[in-house]
Swiss-Prot record:
InterPro entries: Ribosomal_uS7 (IPR000235), Ribosomal_uS7_CS (IPR020606), Ribosomal_uS7_dom (IPR023798), Ribosomal_uS7_dom_sf (IPR036823), Ribosomal_uS7_euk/arc (IPR005716). Belongs to the universal ribosomal protein uS7 family. It comes from Drosophila melanogaster (Fruit fly). PANTHER family: RIBOSOMAL PROTEIN S7. CDD domains: uS7_Eukaryote. Residues 1-22 are annotated as: Disordered. NCBIfam families: PRK04027.1 (NF003106), uS7_euk_arch (TIGR01028). GO terms for biological process: cytoplasmic translation; ribosomal small subunit assembly; translation. Residues 7-16 have a biased composition (Low complexity). This is Small ribosomal subunit protein uS7B. Keywords: Ribonucleoprotein, Ribosomal protein.
Length: 230
């Protein structure tokens, strides 16, 4: 009895399905036109600072300070992808290199989120004080803080002397970032000012070429010693 019921129900279903298929075939399917993306949304650092109008005054550093559109990021964090190969850090966004420089010394080692907050706060302070794009101020500070000439030790026949040498563009950027971060860290030690405020002051003074900047003073000292060892 149950088998007869199953067979009859299957026959009824087989008669209904073709009828439904015919009804569906008559329906007109409307599709939405595909939307074309005419232009990509602009990527701004921290959602505020654009990088399309940044200019680098020193032509020798244009390939080593990455601030163009293809290096734009919302946050200065790339999970170390530029550390896999030698000299690839030249393509690392310059703000991320500045953020990583703040993580030096034991007390700040590995605290990337804290360093990002410091840079974000410092950029807001720079914008309030100068009414300029903080990215442009940072680039100007790095260009002005990198020493063009340094001295090295040369030994011959047991005598050691110092010889003036030219500094490569990548090392100029490396030393500029290190001097700026060191100056901000030392200024904030045992001071009522926060690290973000000291970093903003250091970047503004370095961008102006002022002697109040730790990086500018150290750069002038290195170049003066190198000049005496020519």
């Amino acid at each position: 009895m149950s088998e007869e019921v199953v067979e009859s129900s299957s026959q009824e279903a087989s008669q209904v399905i073709p009828q439904e298929q015919e009804d569906w075939a008559d329906d007109v399917v409307t599709t939405m036109p595909a939307q074309e993306v005419t232009e990509w949304p602009e990527i701004k650092l921290f959602g505020r600072w654009a990088c399309d109008d940044i200019s680098i005054s020193d032509i020798s550093l244009q390939d080593y300070i990455a601030v163009k559109e293809k290096f734009a990021r919302y946050l200065p964090h790339s999970a170390g992808r530029y550390a896999a190969k030698r000299f690839r850090k030249a393509q690392c966004p310059i703000v991320e290199r500045l953020t990583s420089g703040l993580m030096m010394k034991g007390r700040s080692n590995g605290k990337k989120l804290l360093a990002c907050r410091i840079v974000k706060h410092a950029f807001e302070i720079i914008h309030l004080l100068t009414s300029e794009n903080p990215l442009q101020v940072t680039v100007n500070a790095i260009v002005n803080s990198g020493p063009r000439e340094d001295s090295t030790r040369i030994g011959r026949a047991g005598t050691v002397r110092r010889q003036a040498v030219d500094v490569s563009p990548l090392r100029r950027v490396n030393q500029a970032i290190w001097l700026i971060c060191t100056g901000a860290r030392e200024a904030a030690f045992r001071n009522i000012k926060t690290v973000a405020e000291c970093l903003a002051d250091e970047l503004i003074n370095a961008a102006k070429g002022s002697s109040n900047s730790y990086a500018i003073k150290k750069k002038d000292e290195l170049e003066r010693v190198a000049k005496s060892n020519r």
